[in-house]
Amino acid sequence: MIIIAYLLGSIQTGLWIGKYFYQVNLRQHGSGNTGTTNTFRILGVKAGIVTLTIDILKGTLATLIPIILGITTISPFFIGFFAIIGHTFPIFAQFKGGKAVATSAGVLLGFAPSFFLYLLVIFLLTLYLFSMISLSSITVAVVGILSVLIFPLVGFILTDYDWIFTTVVILMALTIIIRHQDNIKRIRKRQENLVPFGLNLSKQKNK
């Protein structure tokens, strides 16, 4: 199951769509990343939506497979984490993958939909306020860590501690933050790419 999840995650949707349908190598354009945001920016809305959908479904499917097969000896959420590893370090693309946001969302959607929806609201609110995908992703990662530690104490969304769930959420979030180090530097310099949505409270001018 772990190998299947990893191979699912290794599917590089944006990279392959760019190569086979647009004759564009995403690694040579924009941020050079093969994930959803750069796909939207370089290849357009249609390619971006397809990439986002498939990257989410990779995580969801990897999480649901053990549930569908009735495997109870290992946590489906733990299995799903290997789809995130595959997305980030894909065997099909020289181990150079995306930033783990969409696939992490898919894993949460498959295992903890209420927690996923809560974080989605945080993501969309941050995006509306600041018009930055990267800042929204980083914010959700930080909020995710805090929430998985605090919510079980008060019984909000997460009713009790599950050490596997807590550990995997923290690992997912740290992966996202680490993969966004270049974005963090650009945000600090007020040079980060913006999306045409929201209030842009930082009043940064798009490049």
Swiss-Prot record:
One of its GO terms (biological process) is phospholipid biosynthetic process. GO terms for cellular component: plasma membrane. Its main location: membrane. Belongs to the PlsY family. The gene is plsY. Catalyzes the transfer of an acyl group from acyl-phosphate (acyl-PO(4)) to glycerol-3-phosphate (G3P) to form lysophosphatidic acid (LPA). This enzyme utilizes acyl-phosphate as fatty acyl donor, but not acyl-CoA or acyl-ACP. It comes from Streptococcus agalactiae serotype Ia (strain ATCC 27591 / A909 / CDC SS700). The keyword Lipid metabolism applies. It catalyses: an acyl phosphate + sn-glycerol 3-phosphate = a 1-acyl-sn-glycero-3-phosphate + phosphate. Probably interacts with PlsX. Its EC number is 2.3.1.275. The lineage of its organism: Bacteria, Bacillati, Bacillota, Bacilli, Lactobacillales. It is a multi-pass membrane protein. Keywords: Cell membrane, Lipid biosynthesis, Lipid metabolism, Membrane, Phospholipid biosynthesis, Phospholipid metabolism, Transferase, Transmembrane, Transmembrane helix. Pathway: Lipid metabolism; phospholipid metabolism. It is an enzyme of class 2 (transferase). This is Glycerol-3-phosphate acyltransferase.
